Amino acid sequence: MVGNNLNLKPAKYDASSIAKYLLSLDPNREYFENKRAKNEITSATITTGNFRLNQMLYLIQILYYLKYERLLFNDKFYAWENGMVIYSVYTHFSSLYYNVNGKNIKNIEDGRIKTFISKCFNYLKTNSDRVLQEFAFTDPVWTSTWGRSSQPEVNFTDKENIGIYRQCCSR
């Protein structure tokens, strides 16, 4: 993340820890399903829970940054065909999915962070997959990044991009 990036403090957690915590909020896997489905918009076959987890991580990162002016985690996002992904979460979804239990979750000790993530999860899980994907597809950061390479890195912390998110959230 170079260029017009804002000065960022190091994040306390990594994306896998946040992903594991999100998965723990859905112990019966009613939301983060490990099933294959055809994407309504792109017609690609996706793993529903993996798609939802990555979209949720992206939206939570944006909301967290706007509220606290720091990143929740430092992992890079990439603009892919079906939206935003964190490569390590995307490629290790199955192991994250099956290994989540209280012993394997990196402790997120900060109650404020846990509350923030829980509130976001409870709100975002009410949105359809189509709504989650349409957010990515209408996000200027995704549209300006998608198609530049086989794995285009998203630079959402660029001052211009943060300005776009602040405008959207102030409505």
Name the predicted role of every residue range.
Residues M1-R171:
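Domain-edge interaction signal
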